């Protein structure tokens, strides 16, 4: 029998957000345990400073073992802190609630603050997978792995990015589902804590331990994009929504600039491991910034915390709606899972998003990930290759603004097709030039601008488009699927790299990325509906989702 929640008074902004999740003491106690456990890994890393910070073959010291135990305890306690009680009842309640940003509401200072925090969150999040390209050369050298500089090593260095990117695919799907019923803010908080704990990958002495921690790091990183985009779709007014979300998602390019700069400055002095250890302060920063991220109003209403929800909706110009995305009163809907995305009326758009996501993944992890390695193979030093990548990404940052304007002005469908075609054209330049581009540094840098920057904006466009396209109850899942597919292409190409004797050259990786992008652009033009400046329920209505009744079997998670 469900208990009727007591009547609430409207809380202050600070009091409302301080509450955050169900068991704050458990969460923050767990966070302290995790942080202490991570810090206990640093003495072993520092002790290897006279050996170039090489830890291969070293046995974990007592401090590291104690740290691992503390991290395990802390993660369990923190998970208990964010999990709501009566989860089955909450799942039923949350599907009845619909929250929509007012289409004509002005951008307020709360929106600006939220967008700023989301930009930082996305940047920190994307720094994880983008670090892989700069970690692999040093990682391969320390462990004697098969790589362009050591073709006779074993096993393949590509195992590290393969495991990490596989983790991001899994994370996108898991976190998308989790955030749809447990709340956006709680999900972001726990993902941020995982950012801190998985940074111990930089202190792991064993090859297998590195792979395990990289997998966990990928799972944590894979969830941030679908959560943040779902939250922005619910709080940003329709007339500003698309362009702003693409602009924030374009911080992927900024993350590449920051990561390449850090690699050039720090790796020569502190080894490749420092790129993972940077996750400690950046993860803590993300936890601190979450004070300015509101909880999902629909989650608060489902928990009986209506006063808090109404206060948040008033600040962000949102409302609770009864519309085509809402089941009729008194109807208990079936559980909406990922299978729902593969049924009419979402099958066509989901197919287009999937094909485009796979193409983007092949570019990002078939070409972009191996740029530092391939530049070193054709004669660049590790430092020079990092600077070349950084400069190209830095010059390409204005492309993010251009892509956001295109999305806002012409809509998602056409801008995604144009940006995909432009990226494919730049990749064709690498197919034609090949290794000879090593002698033409200016041409090389110019060609790198588009795949390093434009493809990041395409990822943002896909996530923004998915967050607008799918109804509220499957929004984070839909965005999670889109984000996961942009990584799934990477899993495919990395699996090929692991099985091949050598990492593919720059010409091969460019060709692998260019072909599916062209196919994806055409597919998207044919099947993708337009979402430009439209209310979320209007998009659902035109898709044919009005009164959609989900089959309990097909829609089961």
Summary of predicted features, one role per range:
Residues 1-14, 46-50, 67-104, 292-346, ...:
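Intracellular cytosolic loops and amphipathic helices of Major Facilitator Superfamily
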Residues 39-45, 113-147, 364-372:
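Extracytoplasmic
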Residues 54-61, 135-169:
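Extracellular/periplasmic helix-loop-helix junction of adjacent transmembrane segments
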Residues 130-137, 342-400:
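Extracytoplasmic gate region of multi-pass secondary transporters
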Residues 170-207:
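Conserved MFS/SLC helix-loop-helix module at the cytosolic interface between two early adjacent transmembrane helices
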Residues 193-206, 422-437:
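C-terminal ends and interior cores of transmembrane alpha-helices
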Residues 203-213, 268-271, 432-446:
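Helix-loop junctions at membrane interfaces in 12-TM secondary transporters
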Residues 240-270, 282-283, 483-493:
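Glycine-rich segments within core transmembrane alpha-helices of 12-TM secondary carriers
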């Amino acid at each position: 029998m469900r208990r009727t929640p007591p009547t609430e008074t409207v809380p202050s902004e600070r009091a409302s957000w301080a509450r955050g999740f169900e068991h704050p003491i458990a969460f923050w106690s767990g966070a302290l345990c995790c942080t202490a456990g991570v810090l206990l890994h640093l003495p072993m890393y520092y002790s290897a400073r006279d050996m170039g910070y090489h830890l291969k073959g070293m046995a974990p010291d007592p401090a590291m073992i104690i740290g691992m135990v503390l991290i395990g305890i802390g993660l369990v306690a923190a998970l208990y802190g964010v999990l709501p009680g009566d989860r089955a009842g909450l799942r039923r309640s949350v599907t009845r609630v619909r929250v929509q940003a007012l289409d004509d509401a002005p951008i307020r200072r709360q929106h600006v603050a939220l967008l700023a925090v989301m930009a930082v969150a996305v940047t920190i999040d994307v720094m994880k997978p983008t670090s892989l390209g700069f970690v692999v050369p040093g990682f391969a050298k320390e462990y004697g792995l098969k790589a362009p500089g050591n073709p006779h090593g074993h096993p393949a260095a590509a195992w590290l990015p393969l495991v990490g990117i596989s983790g991001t695919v899994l994370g996108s799907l898991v976190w998308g589902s989790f955030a749809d019923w447990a709340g956006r803010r709680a999900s972001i908080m726990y993902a941020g804590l995982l950012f801190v704990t998985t940074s111990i990958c930089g202190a792991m002495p064993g090859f297998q331990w590195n792979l395990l921690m990289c997998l966990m790091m990928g799972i944590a990183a894979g969830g941030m994009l679908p959560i943040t985009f779902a939250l922005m779709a619910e709080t940003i007014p329709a007339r500003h929504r698309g362009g702003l979300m693409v602009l924030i998602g374009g911080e992927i390019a900024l993350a590449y600039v920051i990561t390449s700069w850090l690699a050039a400055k720090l790796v020569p002095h502190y080894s490749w491991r420092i790129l993972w250890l940077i996750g400690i302060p950046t993860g803590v920063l993300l936890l601190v910034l979450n004070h300015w991220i509101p909880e999902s109003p629909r989650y608060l209403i489902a928990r009986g915390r209506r006063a808090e929800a109404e206060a948040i909706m008033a600040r962000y110009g949102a409302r609770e709606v009864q519309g085509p995305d809402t089941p009729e009163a008194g109807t208990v809907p079936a559980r909406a899972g990922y299978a729902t995305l593969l049924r009419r009326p979402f099958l066509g758009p989901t197919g287009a998003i999937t094909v485009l996501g796979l193409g983007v993944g092949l570019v990002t992890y078939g070409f972009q990930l191996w740029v530092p390695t391939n530049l070193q193979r054709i004669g660049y030093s590790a430092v020079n290759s990092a600077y070349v990548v950084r400069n190209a990404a830095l010059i390409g940052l204005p492309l993010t603004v251009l892509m956001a304007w295109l999305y806002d002005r012409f809509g998602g469908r056409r801008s995604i097709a144009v940006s995909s075609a432009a990226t494919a054209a730049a990749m064709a330049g690498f197919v034609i030039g090949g290794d000879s581009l090593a002698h033409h540094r200016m041409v090389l840098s110019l060609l790198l601008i588009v795949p390093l920057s434009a493809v990041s904006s395409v990822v943002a466009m896909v996530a923004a488009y998915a967050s607008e396209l799918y109804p509220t109850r499957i929004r984070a899942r839909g965005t999670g699927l889109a984000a996961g597919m942009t990584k799934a292409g990477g899993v495919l190409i990395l699996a090929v790299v692991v099985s091949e004797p050598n990492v593919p050259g720059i010409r091969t990786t460019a060709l692998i990325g260019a072909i599916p992008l062209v196919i994806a652009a055409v597919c998207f033009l044919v099947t993708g509906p337009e979402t430009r400046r439209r209310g979320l329920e209007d998009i659902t209505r035109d898709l044919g989702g009005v009164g959609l009744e989900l089959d309990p079997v097909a829609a089961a998670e």
